[in-house]
């Protein structure tokens, strides 16, 4: 009888640990999706605040400036 109780307790502990692991993974993915949505919103605001100009070219220049070995912006004019 004692063995059965120990087995049942271990089974419940395993179920609890697995359930929490799945819940934590779902929470992390939900947080990641929310973070991505916020990043997209910031980019939209940045494009909106930036007056006139070519949006693609501005984004290209920003990306190029962040690269350490970018010497010129010729490819941005395409």
Curated annotation (Swiss-Prot):
The keyword Nucleotide-binding does not apply. Contains 2 disulfide bonds. One of its GO terms (molecular function) is toxin activity. The keyword Signal applies. Keywords: Disulfide bond, Secreted, Signal, Toxin. Residues 1-24 form the signal peptide. This is U-scoloptoxin(04)-Er1e.
């Amino acid at each position: 009888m004692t063995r059965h109780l120990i087995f049942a307790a271990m089974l419940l502990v395993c179920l609890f640990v697995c359930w929490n692991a799945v819940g934590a993974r779902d929470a992390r993915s939900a947080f990641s999706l929310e973070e991505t949505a916020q990043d997209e919103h910031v980019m939209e605001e940045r494009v909106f605040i930036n007056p006139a100009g070519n949006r693609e070219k501005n984004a290209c220049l920003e990306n190029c400036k962040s690269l350490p070995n970018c010497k010129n912006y010729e490819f941005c004019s395409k």
